[in-house]
Structure formats: structure tokens, C-alpha cells
Amino acid sequence: LEAPSLEAPSLEEPFPVAAPGAFLEKIRGVWAEVLGRPPAAIPYNQSFMSMGGTSLKAIQILGALEDELHIELTHDLLIQCRTIEEMDSYLARKVNMGGNPPSAGERQSAAVQGSGCGDAAIAVIAMACRFPGASSPEEFWHNLLQGKDSIGEVPQDRWNIDDYYSPTPEFGKIYCRNGGFLDNPYGFDAALFGISGDEAAVMDPQQRIVMELVYELIERAGYSRQQMNGRDVGLFVGAGGNSYFEYHLNTLNRMNLQSFDSFSTLTSVQQERIMEEWKRKLGVTGTHPNLLVDNIINMIPARTSQEFNFKGPSMAVDTACSSSLVTLHLAADSIRRGECESAIAGGIHLMLTPTSYQYFSSAEALSPTGRSSVFAADADGFVPGEGAGLVMLKPLEQALRDGDPVLAVLKASGINNDGHSIGVMAPNPDGQRELIESLYIRHNLSPADVQYVEAHGTGTKIGDPSEVRALDSAFKRWGLLRQSVAIGSVKANIGHLLGAAGIAGFIKVVMALQHKIMPPQINVSAPNPMLKFEKTPFYLLAAAQEWPVAEGKARRAAINSFGFGGTNSHMVVEEAPARASAGEAEQPVRAKHVIGLSAQTEHALQQKMLELAAFLEQHGDYPLADVCYTENAARTALPHRFHAVTDSVQDLIGKLQTGVPAAAPVSHSPAMALMFTGQGSQYAGMGRALYDGLPAFRKNVDACSAAFEPYLDLKLTDLI
């Protein structure tokens, strides 16, 4: 070293250091002044807009903070930060870095640009859904395995079917009384997303449900909302109409009705009676400045990407019934091109008014018996259904490196259009065949390695045989044995979910691959004779059976989804690769564990505690360390919290069932400091408890002791 070139150490800080939380009260004071509220009434974690903020008031916030803190700020503060906590973190980074913090996009761009993965396999790392009779993939699978029919009469909280029912087709009337319906499509935890109650009330329930499913999906993948903030996540949502918007139009038309000259000739009693009858039969809603934005279809993914600060592609897809399977294809391709590091894909469809039933009845497309009899001799039309499903995708290699839960692997997918057919709503078997055949050739796959096909099958006498013929024709060149591939359709269980139909079939297949069981095909007393299964590679499952696979082969399924207008999608999905069994190094390293749970409200936290207890009672084989780690590290930190120290799953169940949440909600995370004590903190026997209680600790200490024994007069194990 050349001594003259060394500089003396500076005793002054090169720049001021701001700890987390340093600006909280100053920011809250500014917000209070601009919003006209007392500071104590402004939570640190609630968004500015949800408390009555506007764009003009946001500019006032920016100016007031510059005056208060004596620093220059840009509009980035308003764009990147919605809460006091986020503004505090931003300002702390700005002070500590001596300039504006890099945007999330700048932080991520270097990692993603040019990181496409070619034609690589794509992993499914999480799924979330709401289907008729099921609010989770696990409940959905249970229903499928039991052969449950989740179709029933139109609920009274939708519309009174008796007001519209006619056994014969008649314009404006409905001849099908049944459908697959969600229990509560209107429920929404607005506070969790910082959305005001007034705005939530006018928002399309499809937007609400997708936001909640994305939140659930992230946690099912093993991440917290904070960990996904600002990342290049793509969002692709299949969605068509918005039946909730009809209520907004009805409200507007109800107001317009009062301006009619003829209306003014009625008595006040008659006018009131008409207004009340209108409200009862057609429904009315409130109003909000964001009403239009909150009900546009493209805003389902766009609002969600904005809410979670996702920076990847965000788009709504409408190819009718094939929409949600098409989103999976687009999402996988987007990942392969490097447009996003991971992607969320799926679809949603709700039936909040009778309108779709009225038009489908006019087209005589529905089942008059209200029974979804896919592949059956008595098939007489489709039964509408509603639901939503989303999955998270990631390159398989990256998912394995990151330790993500790989549920299945998307091997290949393709889309095309029928071109000419006998009618705009009629399928073209040749178009379907061409897609299927070309996909296997292009990806060097063989249908002979597929053991199950999840068909589009809707329960029509002509459509089902047409699809089977297209599959049979496409598979012919590979010489499959007759009746060697099982075939089914989830529409028999939950109805035809239109834009969400494909994702329902996809989630069914992934669950079946995970459990290595093929579920039964219900509502088939005798197969449609036009199918001629005995002359094809396909057969129906009357009961659930183990998923057969040849030695050295992987379980594979194919999925069909076809849309009105001719957009077809076909996909091949494979079971997840086997994970290495847990070795001794992965055994628990401590006798006791700390677990923390949080929620937006105390009631939600208590519900979460009971739900986790119920889950552990059913799945007691989950390692306690994994359960605690997931809840501690991969869950979004919310204000109301519960903590416990536990040494077994059974002990944890008891504490969850009887425990009491912390008395006061946490407004923000406290600042932390680390201390390194140096010498003088050691003492004889300091490792005895760990040595006696933890095999992994004991094994490594014994190895160290044996290594030093030739050079010491005593054993290390005797000291510690």
C-alpha cells in the first residue's frame, strides 16, 4: 500500500440518515390540513384518494411537504405513494440517497429486459377461484371428486325466475330455470384495498372479485403484497359483458322517465308506485365520479395492476367462451418473450341480471331441463354458470430456483380461428382439428403421451360429437389405441362459465394432476350415440380412478376451449416434476417457533385464526416450521395482529382457537437497529439447550469438536 494515497477517515456523515418513520407525523399533519381532518383520524396505511383526496389536493400535498421539509420534490412522490407509510419510505430513501429514489420500473428493468426464456416450460405456482359451490381450488376439487352437481335454480337474490319463466321460447322470457351461481358475488373487502364504500358500491363486482383473487393468489404462491410491489407481473383476464352496468343504466333511465311529459300527468301516488316497481324489478344504484371507469371491461385488469403496482402487460381478453384459456396462452408467451417475469391469467363471468338468459332463450341455446348433460344421449343444451379463476405462471426453471410451489407445468399451447363455418355461432371441426394437430407437431409432442382430455363439451347434441370427431381426426396420425384416453368436461358440474369456462377446466386438470386422480363425468346415464366412443381413443369415467401412466412417463392432459366466433385454444399440461425428498439438513432447526398473523380488521383476524386452525386440523402433516415461515415472511403485514410461540401443530391449533389478538392495531412498522456485542458475552454452557434439543445443531457441534480435539486439552462440547 502507498501511504500517501490513503485518505484520513471522515468523522462527519457524508449525508443525513433518515430512519423509517422519521417523516410520518409531518406527512400526517400535512394530510390533515389539506383533507380538513384531525391527524388522529388519518391512518398511516390508508390511501389518500379513499379519504376524499383529489388530484388538486394531491398537488397541495406536494407543495406543503416541500415547504415543511425544505426539500424539492417531484410528481414521482404522488405517483409512487398512496399512503403516509409509502410517502415516509420514499422520503427516507430520498434523504439517504441524496436524490430521487429510482422508480420501481428502473429497479426491475435491468432484471427483465432481454430475459425471455424462448420456448421454455411454464410452471403454475398458484391458483385461486370462486366457482359454483366452491370458494377455493381445494373445495372445488372435493366437489369434483364426489361427483357433485353444483347447478341449481336461479337464486332469489338475483332475480325472480317466476317473473320471467315460460316453458316455451318467447322473446323476453326464459325457459331454463337453473344455472351455476356463486353464493355472494357482491361481497368485497373495500378497506383492504383503500377503496371508499361509496366507490365500491358502484364498482363492477368483476373488478372487486379479481382484486381479491389476485391478493389470495399472491399469498398462495408464497409471497406478500409488499414483495410483489412494483414487479414486472403481467395480468391477462378473460371477460366479456358487465351485467352490473345494466343497473347503472336502469338508474339513469329511471331518472329520464321522470322527465317524460306523460309521466307528469300521473298523480304523485302513481308516480311513486312506478318508481318503486322500477326499483324492485330492474334495480337502481348510487353514483360516483368514477362510475364509468369502474365499469369498463378493460379496467378489470388495469385497475388491479394499478392497485398492486404490477408493471407487466395488463389486458382484458374477449374471445367469448375461449377467453380464459386464451389468456393462459398469451401470458405464457409474454413470459417467454421477456415482457414480464411472471404472469397472472384467467377469467371471470357473472350473471347479475336475467338479460343473458333472455337472449340465450331467444336463440334456443339453453337446456330446457336445466341439467348439464355433457356427452349424454339426453343432452339438450347448455346451462349457464358464473365464476372466476386465476393462476400464476412463471418459467419452470426460475420457479424451481426460487423454491416456488410448482403445481403443474404448461408444456404447450396454441390458438387459431375457424374461418368459415355454417354460422357465426357454429363451430368448424376442421379448424379445431388443424389447431390440435399442428400444436403437437410444432412442439414435438405426441397425443399418445396424453392420458386425459378436458373437453370444451357444453352439453349440446351436435357440438359434443363435433368436438370428439375433431379430436379423433387430429390424433389419428399418431395411431392411438381405442379408448385409451379419458375425456370429460367440468361444465356438467358447474355449467358453462362462458369467459371463465377455460380456466375452470384448467384448474380442474391441475388439481387432478396433483392428486393423480381423474374425477368422474357426471350426468351421463347413456352416452350420446353420435359420439361413437368405441371407435375413438376416448372413454368416459363413470367413477373417479387413479391416473394411469406408463413407466418413465409423466401424467399429461390436454385441454380444449372454443369460443363463439371461432377462436379456438388447445393446451397440454403436465404434472409437476418430482421434488427431492427432505433430507436431514432440512429438518427443523429449533424446538419452538414464533408465528404471526395479521388482517385489516379484528374480525377478519379472528376469522383467519380459525380458518388456519381448521386447515391444520385437516392437514396436520404440514411441517410446523413451514407453516410459521409462510405466515411470517410471505403474508402482507396488516394492522391487526396475533402472535404466538408454539412447539407443535396441535399446540398451535389450540392457541389459534383460543388466542386473543393484540389489543391495539399496528399503525406502522417500528425502526430497528442491530447490535454486535463483540467479546465478553460468552459463558460456559451457553449452547446446552440447543445441543440437547436440536439434532442438526448437535451434529454440527460434534463435528467441530472432533476437528479441534487433537489441538485442545478438552472438548468444545464440554465448554458450550
Regions found by a protein language model. Give the residues of each.
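Phosphopantetheine-dependent thiolation modules in NRPS/PKS and related acyl-activating systems
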Residues: 1-112, 533
